[in-house]
């Protein structure tokens, strides 16, 4: 599971609780692009939604596989 730099940025903002619109504004990308990044992140993390992605993020950080 290798996230691109941009996917990692999106994931970190997701973990902070930002909405898709807020992530789009923060990164100066379209909402469509944000959704595409999230879909890719979910697939790579083998999760189905935002909550599972956040849980998986913290599991990976704890295992030192993601910082």
What are these regions (language model features)?
Residues 1-9, 66-67:
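Regulatory hinge/linker segments at domain boundaries
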Residues 7-9, 25-26, 43, 59:
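Glutamate identity and glutamate-enriched acidic tracts
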Residues 7-10, 14, 53:
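Short alpha-helical "packing" element that flanks the helix-turn-helix/winged-helix DNA-binding module
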Residues 10-12, 38, 59-62:
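Intrinsically disordered, low-complexity segments enriched in glycine/proline and serine/threonine
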Residues 14-18, 57:
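Short helix-to-turn junction characteristic of helix-turn-helix DNA-binding domains
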Residues 19-52:
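Recognition helix of helix-turn-helix DNA-binding domains
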Residues 43-67:
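Basic, Lys/Arg-enriched C-terminal extension of HTH/homeodomain DNA-binding domains
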